């Protein structure tokens, strides 16, 4: 052991060229840390001390300004500090800063499928929001696996992130290790869009049951009575809730719940493409496709069969993603705005990082919107 301080629970170990820094139970790993921190051969050509000497202020004042920390420094001096730093191409040493401030100004995001247009948009919106507040965001993808969720969580904590946004890959997973890991994280965690029920953790999501209800209710209002549902209900709470909304809308108007019109599909285009063959063999006049990828798989099958929307069958999609611009006619869809989701998720995280979060976990439920376009045919009332 090279250094220890029981008061602040900090210790530094060295194993060969690897330095292990433990801060309140969190382990950070660095190679050749002395060179990194010292910048002896590479890195900054100017130091905080040199900038401070040039502007006539203390190094601590310069550090506060360059790290965007609250301080009582005039606007004129702030401008001078930033001009000198820019002229000398000064780049703050983030590793050294994180050791001093006990924060890395980095956050982590785990999504199930980065190829999904919705999750890609969510990641982009969240990264932008984090950057506006001075945070960098590490974006990772679990491939929908609870085991990979667990491994990525551990990797992000090891790399010293200040908090984690988690979109779980398998909401029905009974993986005790993942539950234990989330419950005992040394940093704040916010579950986004999807959640493991019963886990005490901040959650931000849209009302998926309401979304399924709104989509189906709209089809009913347009005269449709035989409405198929293509949904991922076996491995997804979001899919299960959207299915519940679909069934609620049918019950409200006295239509039967017909299991022959409910079809299972994972949130991937090939899965939806395969399931769509059975959907289109029914007498359904409309389909509620419960995600953008599911809708794309359905559209691929329809195109191959030479069927048109809405002439042969009406479709309501989910997510209202950018992929919609590729198709004619444009798809009527339930919209859950990734930017709104990101804003609320970051708000929960900010409160936790600032110590303003309550002892109980917070749950934020947002209302989706129905975006009416051109993919639903209005049927005569007798249909």
Name these PLM-found stretches.
Residues 144, 166-214, 255, 293, ...:
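Flexible loop/hinge segments that line or gate small-molecule binding clefts
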Residues 24-27, 32, 257, 275-383:
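Flexible loop/turn connectors
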Residues 213-255, 260, 358-376:
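An alpha-beta-alpha
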Residues 161-169, 228-230, 262, 280-291, ...:
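Periplasmic-binding protein-like
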Residues 202-229, 244, 248, 269-278, ...:
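Hydrophobic alpha-helical segments within soluble ligand-binding/sensing domains
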Residues 80, 118-132, 211-215, 237-256, ...:
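Short, solvent-exposed amphipathic alpha-helices that sit
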Residues 2-104:
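N-terminal helix-turn-helix DNA-binding module of bacterial transcription factors
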Residues 42-47, 85-118, 122-124, 132-135, ...:
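N-terminal helix-turn-helix/winged-helix DNA-binding helices
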